[in-house]
Amino acid sequence: MRISKQRKKTTLAQQGRYLLICLLSMMLLFLAGSMIILNRTQRQVYERLEEISKLYTDELDNRFFRISRNLFSTVMDSSNPDSDFWKYMDLMEKDQYEEYVVTQLRKKYVSAAWDFGTDYNVFLYTQKDDSLYQLSISSDGFYAIDPYLQEALKRRINSLSQQTYAVKKKWTVMQQGDEVYMLKVAQNQGVGLGCYVNLKTILEPFSKLSLGKSGYVSLVDQNGKNIVTVTEKGIVRDSSQLDTGNYTFRQTLSQSPFEIQIKISWTGI
């Protein structure tokens, strides 16, 4: 009788162990399945964001190229008697027509805001009197330019005056205060037609993506120097506390000396 009770206790204990093993096995299978689904979801998110970033960088390169081609074709057309731009430049040689010429050119470049966006600023530079005029209208509806930026642009233009202009040549970089700009200028016969854009505006669209709590998008130069960083909260002035070397994927800009590095963090998504 005692042996029968002991066997019964042993059988119940074994059944309990078997049940526990089955439950643990089922839990492990569930966790494994969840991990597979999670990994698949992560891959799909990575692939989708990488696809979006590729489309955006392609659009940036295309925009930079179209602007470069526009500047080049306009400035290098000085021998064409039908060139409106050079007719205006001839008038500008007469000081009393300066205001008229600038007004007419601004009317001509109103479309630049639609073609390239208000962040891309087209300007005219005349070497004769070292003057720089904003031609494209800004997002606030004005043609004003910061005087410190204006002087910085003049210095950079003069430093580029001896270099041969090429449509496919990468845009140059200049810094003014805490801001970094990309610049392209075509020069001919003492006249320069150019465009500049603040680098942080290039990255702002990425702040709309689900990058995660510690995710970021950085613009990095050819030497690996971090130029501008964006998180879901916006532009980051001090990126020293971010692990900016541990990115998920990157996209190279062919028209400028930069690459865009993107990190996706699953924490907080």
Residue spans of the language-model regions?
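Solvent-exposed, extracytoplasmic
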Residues: 104-118, 188-228
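Conserved beta-strands of PAS-like sensory domains
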Residues: 135, 143-154, 175-210, 262-265
